[in-house]
Amino acid sequence: MRIMGLDVGSKTVGVAISDPLGFTAQGLEIIKIDEEKAEFGFTRLEELVKQYQVEQFVIGLPKNMNNTNGPRVDASITYGNHIEHLFGLPVHYQDERLTTVEAKRMLIEQADISRGKRKKVIDKLAAQLILQNYLNRNF
């Protein structure tokens, strides 16, 4: 069963996919979106869903450290509602606190990637961490 992980931002959506057995997550790509123009990358998402035969989604919920909803939680849930309606597949939500911080740390410490290059991969890595955390807790 393939699960797709998404890190939804206001300008990009980081995409990750699980292996067929649901053990590991791998970052796929970053889809550019524009909330103001109502461009949410659903066409590209549909291509990936078909290519990888996705059966469900996991979307990161950006909660605050005190467990209250952060300013982007509503946008993430709205995005999830749209893809649930478009694809008819279940959508789960995963607390994503500190995933972007962890992703930045990994890119700096382990990969020694420059700031400019980090911006190009950070959302993809955050999506991978969101999905891997979900897989670790549920499978």
Curated annotation (Swiss-Prot):
HAMAP family from the UniProt entry: Nuclease_YqgF
The UniProt entry lists the main location of this chain as cytoplasm
Subcellular compartments? Cytoplasm
GO BP, one annotated term: rRNA 5'-end processing
**Recorded superkingdom:** Bacteria
Instruction: Give this protein's Gene Ontology molecular function annotations.
Output: nuclease activity
Instruction: Name the top EC class.
Output: hydrolase
What does it do?
A: Could be a nuclease involved in processing of the 5'-end of pre-16S rRNA.
Q: What is this protein called?
A: Putative pre-16S rRNA nuclease
Which GO cellular component term is one of those annotated? cytosol
UniProt-listed Pfam families: RuvX
Question: Mind listing the UniProt keywords for this protein, alphabetically?
Answer: Cytoplasm, Hydrolase, Nuclease, Ribosome biogenesis
Q: What is its EC number?
A: 3.1.-.-
Protein family according to the UniProt entry? Belongs to the YqgF nuclease family.
